Regions:
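Bacterial Sec-dependent N-terminal signal peptides
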Residues: 1-24
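Short, flexible coil/linker elements and helix-boundary hinge sites characteristic
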Residues: 14-15, 74, 120, 138
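Short, low-complexity N-terminal intrinsically disordered segments enriched in polar/charged residues
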Residues: 19-67
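Sec/Tat-exported extracytoplasmic proteins
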Residues: 42-52, 73-77, 118-122
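Intrinsically disordered, low-complexity coil segments
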Residues: 52-53, 78-81, 85-92, 96-104, ...
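Short, well-ordered alpha-helical segments enriched in acidic and aromatic residues
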Residues: 55-87
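Short, solvent-exposed helix-to-loop capping segments enriched in aromatics
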Residues: 89-135
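Exposed beta-sheet edge and beta->alpha loop/turn motif
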Residues: 127-210
Length: 210
């Protein structure tokens, strides 16, 4: 719980590291921060799941966690601008979350809709647990000037009870796309370059082999 509270306080912050280009050492550091950012997202889920039927304070806190969770994603749950291969400005669709129903993958849902629906689940009790450490399965690679991407995977368990009976008991491997962008800001001491980490789509994957 202490970790969740700390993550809530720091939710609006993104990891920054001064750099001109990503070196191997910086890649290792950034990938560790990537795993920590995914852990932060995962830590919010148990505090959101099934809270709509709980006391008022729990519901209000869950809504704050939803907002904090969206801050970790590119576009913060909304469409976001990008430049295509021809140099044209485009709008990319908002990030999505894919879940399963008793082991069958569902159609991906907008993250901005998934989190409130997680809160509104009509079960007596809901548990969302991470069953493994987050693992980088595709290391940072350059996709355009000043932009890198990576993917990471983790196992997640979802359980739901109704009338005291366990009615859903799923365990899925999830893959998270992550973007690392070079940013430049002006300070009184001159320009400063840093790397911003943002999460992308989360999909069901079968690529869990160590």
């Amino acid at each position: 719980m202490k970790r969740i509270i700390l993550a809530f306080i720091l939710c609006s912050l993104t990891f920054m590291v001064q750099a001109q280009e990503i070196t191997e050492s910086e890649k290792a550091t950034l990938e560790q921060r990537v795993k920590e950012q995914i852990d932060d997202f995962i830590s919010y889920l148990p505090e959101i799941a099934g809270k709509s039927g709980k006391p008022y304070k729990e519901k209000v806190l869950a809504q704050k966690y939803i907002k904090s969770a969206l801050e970790l994603f590119i576009g913060k749950g909304d469409q976001y601008p990008y430049i295509d291969q021809n140099g044209n400005k485009r709008l990319h669709e908002a990030v999505k979350m894919q879940t399963t129903s008793r082991g069958v993958p569902n159609r991906p849902k907008l993250m901005k809709r998934y989190l409130p629906s997680l809160m509104n689940l009509p079960y007596q009790k809901v548990e969302v647990d991470k069953c493994s450490a987050v693992r980088i399965n595709k290391h940072l690679y350059k996709i355009s000037e000043g932009r890198y991407a990576a993917t990471a995977v983790y196992l997640q368990a979802f359980r739901a009870w109704r009338d005291g009976r366990l009615i859903i008991d799923d365990k899925d491997a999830k893959q998270v796309t992550v973007y690392v962008d070079k940013k430049v800001i002006e300070t009184p001491n001159g320009s400063k370059t840093f790397w911003e980490i943002q999460l992308g789509d989360i999909r069901i994957t079968s690529d869990w082999g160590e």
